[in-house]
């Protein structure tokens, strides 16, 4: 029975918990958008200068 009370009490504080969870979700979405933007930029560079990109990568010791 005491576990039920704890669960009910914890469920009553849902509004406070949704704040940080919502903020975390927004941060994940923003980071996802940033990653997508970086990947799009890399794709653009590779489409325009793939040969130059490979040469520069090899010259810098890329494997």
UniProtKB/Swiss-Prot annotation:
Entry keywords, A to Z: Coiled coil, Isopeptide bond, Ubl conjugation pathway
Transmembrane spans: none
UniProt GO molecular function: proteasome binding; protein tag activity
Cross-link (Isoglutamyl lysine isopeptide (Gln-Lys) (interchain with K-? in acceptor proteins)): 63
Family named by the database record: Belongs to the prokaryotic ubiquitin-like protein family.
UniProt feature coiled coil, ranges: 25-51
Region (ARC ATPase binding): 20-57
A Pfam family annotated for this UniProt entry: Pup
Domain of life: Bacteria
Residue ranges, annotated region (Disordered): 1-35
Upper lineage: Bacteria, Bacillati, Actinomycetota, Actinomycetes, Pseudonocardiales
Complex and partners: Strongly interacts with the proteasome-associated ATPase ARC through a hydrophobic interface; the interacting region of Pup lies in its C-terminal half. There is one Pup binding site per ARC hexamer ring.
GO biological process, one term: protein pupylation
Gene behind the chain: pup1
Role according to the record: Protein modifier that is covalently attached to lysine residues of substrate proteins, thereby targeting them for proteasomal degradation. The tagging system is termed pupylation.
InterPro entries, alphabetized: Ubiquitin-like_Pup
Protein name, entry field: Prokaryotic ubiquitin-like protein Pup 1
Domain notes: The N-terminal unstructured half of Pup provides a signal required to initiate unfolding and degradation by the proteasome but is not needed for pupylation, while the C-terminal helical half of Pup interacts with ARC to target proteins to the proteasome.
Mod. after translation: Is modified by deamidation of its C-terminal glutamine to glutamate by the deamidase Dop, a prerequisite to the subsequent pupylation process.
Residues with Deamidated glutamine modification: 63
Compositionally biased residues, Basic and acidic residues: 1-12, 24-33
Biological or metabolic pathway of the protein: Protein degradation; proteasomal Pup-dependent pathway
């Amino acid at each position: 029975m005491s576990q039920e009370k704890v669960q009910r009490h914890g469920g009553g504080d849902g509004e406070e918990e949704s704040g940080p969870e919502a903020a975390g979700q927004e941060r994940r979405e923003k980071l996802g958008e940033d990653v997508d933007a970086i990947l799009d930029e890399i794709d653009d560079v590779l489409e325009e200068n793939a040969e130059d990109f490979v040469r520069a990568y090899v010259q810098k010791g890329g494997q």
